[in-house]
């Protein structure tokens, strides 16, 4: 798979065929940031407080909305307001993994109404092509008002030790991304997918790569998480770095967000030769 990692964000913002990807790279260029904060807190107050304090330094806020003990409509209106105030996108890390009929209901209905507020969601291709088709159908429905502002990341590899998301699984991830490129922004992966080759490559192909498990200080945790530094992640092909505990659990989360912003941006400038 071809990589556009050497191309500056502003050029990708101008040329990208996907409108949400264009917006993502525009925000990154304006804020000089490639940081996505994974705010794995358990109350609405904590989540909105972090989003407000860290908003100026991040491009994306990644949520696990189902771990909130007090989720309500106020949670969503608060997130939407802060997204507009600080110009960041919301990524609900739902990791859809079920049959198509079920994931459509999880995405577009249920208690969480994810399609109404999350710009980005993610899914695994373990159930086969039907899961991507089902999610894409929701976003392309004639009566869905947010079509140009919604996108999917496919979970192509994982940072947990012993992950089975390798080989044929990763190849299928790339194949389905190419098939549904109008809806699929790119991948969540621990490394560049440049060496993964499948049919269907297009000249304007430019999939966005998010890398999780980015931490300036730690090598991992007791539950199998394996960390990378911002420099190693960006140098390895990541367009955006996702950090959770390294930022929100720091003694001063704002200072931590600034440090990750600088480290990630410096690594990006080095990658594009600036």
From Swiss-Prot:
<feature type="binding site">
    <location>
        <position position="245"/>
    </location>
    <ligand>
        <name>substrate</name>
    </ligand>
</feature>
<keyword id="KW-0210">Decarboxylase</keyword>
<keyword id="KW-0665">Pyrimidine biosynthesis</keyword>
<dbReference type="Pfam" id="PF00215">
    <property type="entry name" value="OMPdecase"/>
</dbReference>
<dbReference type="GO" id="GO:0044205">
    <property type="term" value="P:'de novo' UMP biosynthetic process"/>
</dbReference>
<comment type="pathway">
    <text>Pyrimidine metabolism; UMP biosynthesis via de novo pathway; UMP from orotate: step 2/2.</text>
</comment>
<feature type="binding site">
    <location>
        <begin position="62"/>
        <end position="64"/>
    </location>
    <ligand>
        <name>substrate</name>
    </ligand>
</feature>
<dbReference type="GO" id="GO:0005829">
    <property type="term" value="C:cytosol"/>
</dbReference>
<comment type="similarity">
    <text>Belongs to the OMP decarboxylase family.</text>
</comment>
<dbReference type="InterPro" id="IPR014732">
    <property type="entry name" value="OMPdecase"/>
</dbReference>
<dbReference type="InterPro" id="IPR013785">
    <property type="entry name" value="Aldolase_TIM"/>
</dbReference>
<dbReference type="InterPro" id="IPR011060">
    <property type="entry name" value="RibuloseP-bd_barrel"/>
</dbReference>
<keyword id="KW-0456">Lyase</keyword>
<dbReference type="InterPro" id="IPR001754">
    <property type="entry name" value="OMPdeCOase_dom"/>
</dbReference>
<feature type="binding site">
    <location>
        <position position="40"/>
    </location>
    <ligand>
        <name>substrate</name>
    </ligand>
</feature>
<protein>
    <recommendedName>
        <fullName>Orotidine 5'-phosphate decarboxylase</fullName>
        <ecNumber>4.1.1.23</ecNumber>
    </recommendedName>
</protein>
<dbReference type="GO" id="GO:0004590">
    <property type="term" value="F:orotidine-5'-phosphate decarboxylase activity"/>
</dbReference>
<dbReference type="GO" id="GO:0006207">
    <property type="term" value="P:'de novo' pyrimidine nucleobase biosynthetic process"/>
</dbReference>
<feature type="active site" description="Proton donor">
    <location>
        <position position="95"/>
    </location>
</feature>
<feature type="binding site">
    <location>
        <begin position="93"/>
        <end position="102"/>
    </location>
    <ligand>
        <name>substrate</name>
    </ligand>
</feature>
<feature type="binding site">
    <location>
        <position position="227"/>
    </location>
    <ligand>
        <name>substrate</name>
    </ligand>
</feature>
<dbReference type="InterPro" id="IPR018089">
    <property type="entry name" value="OMPdecase_AS"/>
</dbReference>
């Amino acid at each position: 798979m071809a990589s556009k990692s050497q191309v500056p964000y502003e050029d990708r913002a101008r040329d990208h065929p996907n409108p949400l990807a264009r917006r993502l790279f525009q925000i990154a260029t304006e804020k000089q940031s490639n940081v996505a904060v994974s705010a794995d807190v358990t109350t609405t107050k904590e989540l909105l407080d972090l989003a407000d304090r860290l908003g100026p330094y991040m491009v994306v806020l990644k949520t696990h909305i189902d771990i909130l003990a007090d989720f309500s409509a106020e949670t969503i209106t608060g997130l939407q307001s802060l997204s507009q105030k600080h110009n960041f996108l919301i990524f609900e890390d739902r990791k859809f993994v079920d049959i198509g009929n079920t994931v459509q209901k999880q995405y577009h209905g249920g208690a969480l109404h994810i399609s109404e507020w999350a710009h980005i969601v993610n899914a695994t291709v373990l159930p086969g092509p039907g899961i991507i088709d089902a999610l894409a159908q929701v976003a392309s429905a004639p009566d869905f008002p947010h079509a140009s502002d919604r996108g999917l990341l496919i979970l192509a590899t994982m940072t947990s030790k012993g992950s089975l998301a390798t080989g044929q699984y990763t190849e299928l991830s790339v194949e389905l991304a190419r098939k549904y490129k109008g809806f699929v922004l790119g991948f969540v992966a621990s490394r560049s997918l440049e060496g993964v080759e499948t049919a269907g490559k297009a000249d304007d192909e430019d999939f966005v790569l998010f890398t999780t498990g980015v931490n300036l200080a730690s090598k991992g945790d007791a539950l199998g998480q394996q960390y990378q530094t911002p420099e190693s992640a960006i140098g390895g092909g990541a367009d955006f770095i996702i950090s959770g505990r390294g930022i929100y659990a720091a003694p001063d989360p704002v200072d931590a967000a600034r440090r990750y912003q600088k480290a990630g941006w410096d690594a990006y400038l080095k990658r594009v030769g600036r």
